Amino acid sequence: MGSIQASVRVGVVGLGNIAQQHIRNLVEGHVAGAVLTATCSRSQRPEGLATSVAHYQDYRTLVDSGVCDAIVVATPTHSHLDIGRAVLDANLHLMMEKPMGLSIQEGESLLSRCTPNSVAALMLNQRADPLFLRMKEIIESSILGDLIRINWCMTNWFRPEIYFQVSDWRATWRGEGGGVLVNQCIHNLDILQWLCGMPTSVRAHCQFGRFHDVEVEDDVTAYLEYKNGATGVFVGSTGEAPGVNRFEVIGDAGSLVFDGSQLSLAQNTPSTAMFNRTTKQMFGMPETVTDLLAIDRKVNQHAILMQNFVNAIRDNEPLIAPLAEGLRSLSIANAMLLSTWQEQTIQFPLDANEYQAHLQNKIDQSALRVKADVEAEINMDSSYR
């Protein structure tokens, strides 16, 4: 695409919690070169928007309306495939909320609708977190040397029962295709592979409805192996409070450790491998220098991703999170579930058809829940980790 000077006309499908955030970012001017021209949901028009913002109750009508250049899809996961395909088939640009679908088969189907002129992105907003940008910079600089071990204990995604009760689709196979892996931890799995690459295999143990009245996984422990021999452990849960967020990336020349509040960088002189082969000290260790790295994480991650999406449409700016890269984290999440169901190690690349058959069996036995008639107190700032 060539450079476009006109503002990108954006429509938002969905009016739930995250959709409201995208709408605010657009109308409050946090995304330069973009204008909100339409919303879409089965409910009534949202309050407080300018009369120039059209409202539709059917996404197909919105797609055919001609009032948008790009569509943000922020709806329940089970609708992502149909809406996303409609957007791309209409030659509109797509920003999809995570995950891109219930399974990698759905993700691949969606990607097949993209054309060379499509700008298709996924809202993997944690790629804009200065913490992970700094970690990525350090890892790619080879300061850590060859990676040896990656551990991430991510159990501070606590969700109380009301979080599920007020939704008919959350934490159901039919509505979401999974639980903590595809909803909360999909961000962490994306960052894990973005920083350290894709594993070659995974053996996982998922527990279903351990802490909540749900049919999907709400607690996961997984063992990962990588091509160079590195290993990893990933733990995720929505049932622990206060929970832990500890991320360790260990190399033979140093390590990065995020303890939930601070990032530390340790550097070995010489590398562990070199010291191991050359030292005469029976109980010696390489000299290590550890520094605490100051990082200001107070940024609007969603606005940064949306700005990048708009810039890609207008000026061909490379996408921070192309839609295609959503297959990686979704593949890891799917493999962890399949490993649990089959009680065996799963190799990558994951067999999409095999996983889909298992998932479809779960979906066939699943149903959307009846929403509880309760009023939930919502503070979206408390949902981010």
Task: Show which residues each predicted segment covers.
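N-terminal Rossmann-like dinucleotide-binding module
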Residues: M1-A50
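Beta-strand-loop-alpha-helix segment that lines the small-molecule cofactor/substrate pocket
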Residues: A70-T77, L81-R127, S142
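Conserved SAM-binding strand-loop segment of SAM-dependent methyltransferases
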Residues: V53-Y59
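Predominantly a Rossmann-like dinucleotide-binding segment in NAD(P)-dependent oxidoreductases
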Residues: R127-D213, E343
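Short, well-ordered coil/turn residues at beta-beta hairpins
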Residues: A74-T75, L195, V235, G251
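Glycine-rich phosphate/pyrophosphate-binding beta-alpha loops
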Residues: I186, F211, V235-G243
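C-terminal glycine/acidic-rich active-site capping loop/insertion
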Residues: A253-A321, I346, A357-R385
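Active-site beta-strand termini and strand-to-loop segments that position acidic
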Residues: E217, A222-N228, V249-G251
